[in-house]
């Protein structure tokens, strides 16, 4: 795997292939039939990843993944609905903030940052509050890399007749989610994560029946997924100026995704990256924050060294000078830093990153790990 520096060991934006970057060198007319066909092909390929063509629509939206999350909640949760937000990290808290800003009634259930929400938790919460209409959760909480038990939670939500909204930003394309087996109203992801496109486009897999009933719910013209889908279905076009180069890059990235072997192969490479990282960092004495049983192969949080000579900014700049971009920690209780396992990188790239980190710690004379 040929990789250009710097290598972004982050959860997105991430390192992309030369072919993906090359795809952005062509300009597209936003109303041109060829571009409309590109968008339609993109949505078909995305739906195929979740086996969702019969049950869900793929609604693309300009902007970051958070734009798409806000659009999904604003469109699919009625104004008199109530959302149970499951939280064990920063992105769950962001979900709650979105509900607050949109004026949707909500309650929260928060566990520690190293504790997944359980199906038993959700069962108890739904039994206690019949006014809840929707449950929202983060599949892979990017602030730590923790994986929440989606299939089990989805079954509990469905058994109570409630609707499920899944933020799968950091898992879609790498971890299996089958719409035929996991009932959900919305699953949200974005171009610049495990599909290895560039940032700038989110997309929502919305249950067909729920989206059809969602007219008038949205708080925003631009983020109205019901209107976005209706217009696209009628005209083949985006309502407002699309991110043409981002769409073209994602289309090319999906071709490479299929060539690699689709989700099983992408998952296998990321899992190998993750294990290579854990093994290598462990040899340096660096401890991961999560036990491996709940660690998703997306991003790994490591405890910062105890040595007072360790300062993250200096550490970051030195590792960057060796060709690798890391991610700061996002925990409130302990000092950490994060290393991503995703993007156009393989085992050799992860080994090189560990070697660079080892050199930097030696240069900084960090002895107390």
From Swiss-Prot:
<comment type="function">
    <text>Involved in phosphonate degradation.</text>
</comment>
<keyword id="KW-0663">Pyridoxal phosphate</keyword>
<dbReference type="InterPro" id="IPR015421">
    <property type="entry name" value="PyrdxlP-dep_Trfase_major"/>
</dbReference>
<dbReference type="Pfam" id="PF00266">
    <property type="entry name" value="Aminotran_5"/>
</dbReference>
<keyword id="KW-0670">Pyruvate</keyword>
<dbReference type="InterPro" id="IPR015422">
    <property type="entry name" value="PyrdxlP-dep_Trfase_small"/>
</dbReference>
<protein>
    <recommendedName>
        <fullName>2-aminoethylphosphonate--pyruvate transaminase</fullName>
        <ecNumber>2.6.1.37</ecNumber>
    </recommendedName>
</protein>
<comment type="similarity">
    <text>Belongs to the class-V pyridoxal-phosphate-dependent aminotransferase family. PhnW subfamily.</text>
</comment>
<comment type="subunit">
    <text>Homodimer.</text>
</comment>
<dbReference type="InterPro" id="IPR015424">
    <property type="entry name" value="PyrdxlP-dep_Trfase"/>
</dbReference>
<dbReference type="InterPro" id="IPR000192">
    <property type="entry name" value="Aminotrans_V_dom"/>
</dbReference>
<feature type="modified residue" description="N6-(pyridoxal phosphate)lysine">
    <location>
        <position position="193"/>
    </location>
</feature>
<dbReference type="InterPro" id="IPR024169">
    <property type="entry name" value="SP_NH2Trfase/AEP_transaminase"/>
</dbReference>
<dbReference type="InterPro" id="IPR012703">
    <property type="entry name" value="NH2EtPonate_pyrv_transaminase"/>
</dbReference>
<keyword id="KW-0808">Transferase</keyword>
<keyword id="KW-0032">Aminotransferase</keyword>
<dbReference type="GO" id="GO:0047304">
    <property type="term" value="F:2-aminoethylphosphonate-pyruvate transaminase activity"/>
</dbReference>
<dbReference type="GO" id="GO:0019700">
    <property type="term" value="P:organic phosphonate catabolic process"/>
</dbReference>
